[in-house]
Structures are given as C-alpha cells and as structure tokens.
C-alpha cells in the first residue's frame, strides 16, 4: 500500500536540519505500518520499541536521559548495533512514557546523527495535558486516512491517480465514469488502511463494514480507557450525535442535538478531547475573507466532521446498495457524506487553512473557504451535477476572489474566475 507521506519521510531523512520526527494521527490510520515500511525501504536496520507493551523501556528512560546511555540500553534490548547512518529508531505509543518524549530534546541537541521517528495514537492528548515536551526540538508529520488518490492506487488504479495529479482534465473527463464509480466505493470504504486493504484484496463490502465496526468499537473503548471519567458520557453523546449533525441542511454544530438543554461549556472539553485524538475535525466559521483567514475565525460557530467518510457511513447504518445504486430517500444524507469527503481530502493538503463562511445575517453560506497562504478560495459542495450556487455568486459579488470553486459530479469547467472541479479531483484545489 502506497502512502504519499512516504515522500515526506524520505525528505526528512535527507534533510541536513533533521530533528526527531513525531507522526501525529488518529488510531488506526497507519502510523505504525508507515514507520516500519519506511525503515524497511530506506534503512539497513530498524529498532522498534512499543512503549505501551514494554515496561523495561519505561525503566530505561526513568532516570538518566544521557543519549549514550539510552543508545546502549536500546542496543542491549534489541540485540543489535545501532548505526547512526543506517538504523532507524522507532518509538511507538511514545505518549505512554513521557520521559521518552523528553529524551527527544537531548537526542536533537547531543546526538542529532540518530534517525528517530515517533508516533502515538493518543499523543495529542498527552501533549495537551502538559507532558514535558521538547518544543522546537522535533519535526512533525500529520497522517490521515488514505485520500481518494491513495485509494485509487491501493485499488490497482495507479494510472488514474497519476492522471489526477497531472490535471489533464480533457482526458480525465474521458474516464469520468471510472472515477465516479471509484468515488462511490470510497464513500463506503473510506480511507482507513485496514478497510482499504480488505476491499482491494476481496471487494467484499460486508467485510469492510465489519472492519469499520471494529475500529469504531476500539474508539469507544479508548473513551473509557483514556478520557477523564467525568467527561466519558459527554464524549459518547457528542460522538454519536455527529451523523445527525451532518445530516442537517445547516451543518453548524448544535449542542441541543447532543442533549436537550446542553450548553457549550458542558461539552467544550469533550470536543477538545476528540479533536486532540484526531477523531474529529473542527471547522470554524469566518465572516470575512481576508488573509490570514484565522484572524476572522468565530470560535463559537463550527462544524464537526469525523476522521473518515467510511466510518461516518458505518455510524449512520448506511447500506452498500443505498450508496452504490442510489435511492431517493438518501438524497439528504448524500450531502453529509459529500461534505465529509471534501473536508477529509482538504485536510490532507499541507498548510491549508480550512474554514466555512456565513455572513452575519446567515443568508449566505459557503461550505468551505480555504486559505492557501497566497489566496482565499471559496468552495461550494454539490453532491450531484446541480450547478446552481446562489451563495457562491453572492460571495463573489462581495469579495471578488481570484478564483471560486464549485465541486460536484459535473465535468471540469472554467469560466472567468469560477471553476467547476469534479469531486474526485478536489485534492487538486491548491494547484488551480
């Protein structure tokens, strides 16, 4: 299975300013596999340490963090010589031993020749809770579920993925039915590596759904195991409300859908916990279109999306036939899946600020508005081929953006400053 993040890891390996690397991401998005595969492909040897299942390693880091001493201990544990130039050190579930995190500072300052990559499913929570952290002494890489282009590659359609990257839209249009069929499959399967691998090998949607159910069950177990007891019920209620939140025409998060009479102060910690885990994406509202968009962020108004479109369908009980064959009763939730899909693809684009826009009266709403650092692009999302976009026109008249995007199942088309970008090509938005 190919992950685009592998290119970023290789760039990190070759950098003269390399620091210990921390890979962030939700549970089961493929962090462990990526680190091990990176070691297998680009290093002579790999020493893998899982701090969740190895108490001896906790003892090693408990006292002195002298790097020579630590390397000796790792060599004794692994039974292998650690060559700074040819050995990859992998620290997995590193949040379980906070002093292992702290040691990264000393590796950077005193032994930068060693190649160290770290990951942890709940690392975001550990950092937020005040674990001593080597600020400025580490590099970061965020890993998400497989994007649609990665899904195409995993499904044996590498050339189709390459064609999207080349943005040859006349040729892309010639093969649009292949892309549309694959996109419908992606809506069901999503991008969680185990689900994608199963689908690529067996094409069994029932098996995919069982895998997704197991992943969701593991997340629920994490709530009980790792979250503070007093907020576990709130996390569960909030988590389970997300499909119904997104099924509404106005997808702004409403606390009253979690529990009648609920208020923001009751659930802010639960949202933060899920966000720190990487299980939800919080997309805030802006009411203006200046650069940087973050300066116009309204922290009180936001949408909550799940980490993966396949998991959203699983939580909602969406059947394969309904999605692939179509059903008139499915129209409303199709909008939820489509917006979830677009959010998920946008999140994979590096250094892209993602928000949504409404004016103060609420009469104009743009599904997403993204900040590339050089320009602000409004993005209107359509689940089918309907190209009517009244809000987008209103936005254009007010802010006159250099480019506006309407993404739908319709073919690529550019008229003046308006681009219709096919949903299956939305990853290319920053390249327009």
Descriptions of predicted regions:
Residues 200-365, 369-370:
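Accessory nucleic acid-recognition modules appended to NTPase machines
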Residues 346, 366-385, 404:
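Conserved catalytic cores of phosphodiester-cleaving nucleases, focusing on short active-site segments
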Residues 53-85:
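Short glycine-rich substrate-engagement loop in P-loop NTPases that contacts/grips substrate
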Residues 34, 38:
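Hydrophobic positions on the alpha1 helix immediately C-terminal to the Walker A/P-loop
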Residues 31:
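Conserved lysine of the Walker
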Residues 128-247:
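Interdomain motor-coupling "hinge/lid" segment immediately C-terminal to the ATP-binding subdomain
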Residues 90, 115-121, 142:
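Structural recognition of the conserved hydrophobic beta-strand(s) that form the central parallel beta-sheet
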Residues 2-16:
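Pre-Walker A adenine-sensing motif
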């Amino acid at each position: 299975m190919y992950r685009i993040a592998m290119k970023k890891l290789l760039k990190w390996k070759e950098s003269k300013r390399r620091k210990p690397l921390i890979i962030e991401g939700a549970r089961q998005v493929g962090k462990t596999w990526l680190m091990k595969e990176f070691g297998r492909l680009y290093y002579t040897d790999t020493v893998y340490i899982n701090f969740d299942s190895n108490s001896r390693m906790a003892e090693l880091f408990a006292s002195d963090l002298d790097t020579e001493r630590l390397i000796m201990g790792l060599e004794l544990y692994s039974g292998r010589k650690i060559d700074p130039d040819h050995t990859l050190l992998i620290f997995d579930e590193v949040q379980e031993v906070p002093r292992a995190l702290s040691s990264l500072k000393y590796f950077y300052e005193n032994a930068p020749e060693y190649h160290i990559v770290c990951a942890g499913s709940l690392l975001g929570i550990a950092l937020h809770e005040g674990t001593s952290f080597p600020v400025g002494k580490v590099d970061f890489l965020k890993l998400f579920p497989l994007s649609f282009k990665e899904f195409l590659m995993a499904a044996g359609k590498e050339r189709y993925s390459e064609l999207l990257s080349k943005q040859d839209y006349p040729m892309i249009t010639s093969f649009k039915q292949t892309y549309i069929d694959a996109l419908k499959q992606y809506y069901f399967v999503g991008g969680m590596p185990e689900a994608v691998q199963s689908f690529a090998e067996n094409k069994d949607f029932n098996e995919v759904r069982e895998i997704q159910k197991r992943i969701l069950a593991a997340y629920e177990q994490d709530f009980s195991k790792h979250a503070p007891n007093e907020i576990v019920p709130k996390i569960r209620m909030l988590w389970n409300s997300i499909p119904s939140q997104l099924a509404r025409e106005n997808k702004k998060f409403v606390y009253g859908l979690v529990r009648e009479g609920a208020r923001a102060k009751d659930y802010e910690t639960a949202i933060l916990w899920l966000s720190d885990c990487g299980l939800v994406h919080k997309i805030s509202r802006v009411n203006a279109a200046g650069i940087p968009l973050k300066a116009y962020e309204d922290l009180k108004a936001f949408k909550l999306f799940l980490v993966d479109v396949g998991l959203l369908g699983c939580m909602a009980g969406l059947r394969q036939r309904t999605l692939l064959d179509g059903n008139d009763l499915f129209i409303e939730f199709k909008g939820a899946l489509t917006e979830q899909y677009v959010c998920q693809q946008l999140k994979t684009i590096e250094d892209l600020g993602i928000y949504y826009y409404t004016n103060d009266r609420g009469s104009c709403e743009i599904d997403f508005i993204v900040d590339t650092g050089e320009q602000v692009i409004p993005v209107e999302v359509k689940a089918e081929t309907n190209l009517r976009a009244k809000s987008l026109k209103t936005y254009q008249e007010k802010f006159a953006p250099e480019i506006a995007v309407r993404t739908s199942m319709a073919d690529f088309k550019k008229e003046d400053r308006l681009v219709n970008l096919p949903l299956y090509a939305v990853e290319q938005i920053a390249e327009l």
